[in-house]
Amino acid sequence: MTRHLIFAAMLLVCLFVCWNAVGARDARSAFSLEETAQDEHVMEERIFINPAGNREKNACLENCRSSPNCENYEFCSK
């Protein structure tokens, strides 16, 4: 009888540990996806918002954003 209780207790402990490990992995994965989305949004803001108020550069960025052939924004910084 005691062996069965010990076995059941060990089984419950193992299940609890495994369940927490799976939950932690899912939480890390969800956090990583959210963090990536936030990083992309921040990078987009850095590209299209010009805090110095340089209107020519902003116009260049807007034109480039609307152009399907534009691959990078390097020429706008010149």
Curated annotation (Swiss-Prot):
Does Disulfide bond appear among the keywords? yes
GO MF terms listed in the record are: toxin activity
Location(s) in or outside the cell = Secreted
| Propeptide stretch(es), residue numbers | 25-28
Query: Keywords, A to Z?
Result: Disulfide bond, Secreted, Signal, Toxin
Q: What is this protein called?
A: U-scoloptoxin(04)-Er1d
Mod. after translation: Contains 2 disulfide bonds.
What is the residue range of the signal peptide feature? 1-24
Q: In which tissues is it expressed?
A: Expressed by the venom gland.
* UniProt family annotation: Belongs to the scoloptoxin-04 family.
**Which domain of life, per UniProt?**
Eukaryota
Give the GO cellular component terms, alphabetically: extracellular region
